[in-house]
């Protein structure tokens, strides 16, 4: 199918219901980056020449063939520097492609939420995963919502939080008071899920004392069930529980996979998150990769 003229000021945009009739084919050109022959077009109204590649998000990329490899490496526990070494490119190339892929993944994640039937989800699991930026004195909480049937990630929000326990005094002394942004993240996450979750859906969480008030604010008729947390089956990996039956297995298993497949979330690693924005971009990328490739193709909420 012929594309329409990309010029928004072209007269063909107002030439009836189908502006594609104002475009004609005009040969091909050879693209050296991936060895493809790309079709050229010409608009009969403004005489502008353009190609089918001009409408793609990878327009003018020189190494577009590396996009899928960067995606697979960064969602398989490989760091950005090691990805650059394995692919034989400059580390800055991997950083640029990481940011590009994260932007595309964010759009894909929004499309997935729109594809879910309105208020069709009757069960949701919700919990927080904790990590840090630069140092453990700067913790970050990632609120995560998962469909227990398909195990697809429905949404997340990463928020800064103050340090707890023995690190709290050291954190205040070195970096000053740290604002707790988790309430804002919880409100944003629940607000994002309002169109697709049934008002009387069953929400399963741990016994966090803060969850009920925020759940009541966005889903006043929802059924809220809690389950006590348990010890991790492996020291330092609290996501996988030691007890025999885990009611929140879908969410805990998702968190365990996040720690296994995202290098910056490893328990013992020097590839720590440097900025909150970088963590959010990586989570967007992995969420799309998981929902697309690592979870079964089931209808959301179908058990």
Segments predicted by a language model, with ranges:
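Residue-level recognition of single "structural anchor" positions
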Residues: 1-303
């Amino acid at each position: 199918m012929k594309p329409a003229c990309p010029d928004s000021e072209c007269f063909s945009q107002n030439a009836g219901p189908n502006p594609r009739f104002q475009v004609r084919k005009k040969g091909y050109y050879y693209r050296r980056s991936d060895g493809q022959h790309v079709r050229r077009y010409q608009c009969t109204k403004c005489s502008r020449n353009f190609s089918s590649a001009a409408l793609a998000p990878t327009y003018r990329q020189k190494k577009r063939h590396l996009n899928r490899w960067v995606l697979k490496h960064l969602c398989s526990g490989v760091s950005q520097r090691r990805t650059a070494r394995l692919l034989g490119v400059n580390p800055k190339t991997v950083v640029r492609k990481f940011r590009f892929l994260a932007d595309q993944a964010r759009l894909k994640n929004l499309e997935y939420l729109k594809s879910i039937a309105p208020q069709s989800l009757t069960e949701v699991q919700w919990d927080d995963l904790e990590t840090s930026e630069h140092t453990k004195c700067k913790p970050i909480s990632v609120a995560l919502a998962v469909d227990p049937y398909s195990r697809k990630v429905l949404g997340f929000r990463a928020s800064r939080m103050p340090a707890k326990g023995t690190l709290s005094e050291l954190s205040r002394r070195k970096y000053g008071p740290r604002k707790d942004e988790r309430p804002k993240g919880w409100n944003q996450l629940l607000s994002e899920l309002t169109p697709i979750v049934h008002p009387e859906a069953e929400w399963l969480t741990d016994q966090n004392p803060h969850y009920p008030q925020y759940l009541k604010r966005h889903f006043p008729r929802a059924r809220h069930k809690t389950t006590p947390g348990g010890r991790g089956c492996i020291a330092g990996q609290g996501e996988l529980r030691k007890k025999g039956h885990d009611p929140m297995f879908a969410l805990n298993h998702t968190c365990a996979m996040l720690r296994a497949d995202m290098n910056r979330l490893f328990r013992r690693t020097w590839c720590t998150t440097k900025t909150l924005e970088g963590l959010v971009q990586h989570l967007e990328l992995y969420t799309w990769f998981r929902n697309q490739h690592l979870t079964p193709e089931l209808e959301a909420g179908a058990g």
